[in-house]
Amino acid sequence: MHIIQNTITILNNFVDISGVEVGQHLYWQIGNFEVHGQVLLTSWFVLAVLLGLAVLTVRDPQTIPTGQQNFAEYLLEFIRDLARTQIGEEEYISWVPFIGTLFLFIFVSNWSGALVPWGVVKLPHGELAAPTNDINTTVALALLTSVAYFYAGLAKKGLSFFGKYIQPTPILLPINILEDFTKPLSLSFRLFGNILADELVVAVLVSLVPLVVPIPVMLLGLFTSGIQALIFATLAAAYIGESLENHH
């Protein structure tokens, strides 16, 4: 009973974390729910960019790829190699779409914060920023990773998947349970903190010094944004691979 109460407390903490606010927000009332409108707007923008690039890439496929198709195939190979390395040769192929979607969404979201002049768009309330600049987005991505983790383990092993919680000794049961719920929490905090800090540093420098001075910081932000997307996707794949591996 104590373990169940701890688990419920952790889930409630996720809900509390999603209420953390940085800056001003535009709220939409949907039924009995209040949602962050600017997060949905920027997320839809990112999805539109990804869908647009996908359509441009596949509309005229060639036997010998060139240009956009060549880049898309290289990107696919990169994601497949990442999934193969972290998940394993036998299981990785079915998880390539999930890992690829995570990586591309986070990557484009992060870059949109540095490349898209969100401040030009004026809202009645709040301000636009990268989707990953809002902890609601990062917590949602982390929870998706957690759901994928349990789905992968249960789909392969059934209820025997839960046997790993009493290995190597039943005494570690509470710690093993907490570990699985704190993994996505660390993922969301890492991504949210890095993207928010990067945008705040650039905003402060732009307000204090001429535009040319913050450019090196912006370039560094683009690099670290890509690294953060890679780290998130790699750790998500590693967690899924961990749930699929055999425990003896």
From Swiss-Prot:
Transmembrane segment boundaries: 38-58, 96-116, 135-155, 200-220, 221-241
UniProt GO MF annotations: proton-transporting ATP synthase activity, rotational mechanism
Keywords from the UniProt entry: ATP synthesis, CF(0), Chloroplast, Hydrogen ion transport, Ion transport, Membrane, Plastid, Thylakoid, Transmembrane, Transmembrane helix, Transport
InterPro entries xrefs: ATP_syn_F0_a_bact/chloroplast, ATP_synth_F0_asu, ATP_synth_F0_asu_AS, F0_ATP_A_sf
Signal peptide location: none
Membrane topology of the entry: Multi-pass membrane protein
Pfam families in the record: ATP-synt_A
Domain of life, per lineage: Eukaryota
One GO CC term on file: proton-transporting ATP synthase complex
Xref: SUPFAM superfamilies: F1F0 ATP synthase subunit A (SSF81336)
Subcellular location: Plastid, Chloroplast thylakoid membrane
Quaternary structure, from the entry: F-type ATPases have 2 components, CF(1) - the catalytic core - and CF(0) - the membrane proton channel. CF(1) has five subunits: alpha(3), beta(3), gamma(1), delta(1), epsilon(1). CF(0) has four main subunits: a, b, b' and c.
Family designation: Belongs to the ATPase A chain family.
Function per UniProt: Key component of the proton channel; it plays a direct role in the translocation of protons across the membrane.
UniProt name for this protein: ATP synthase subunit a, chloroplastic
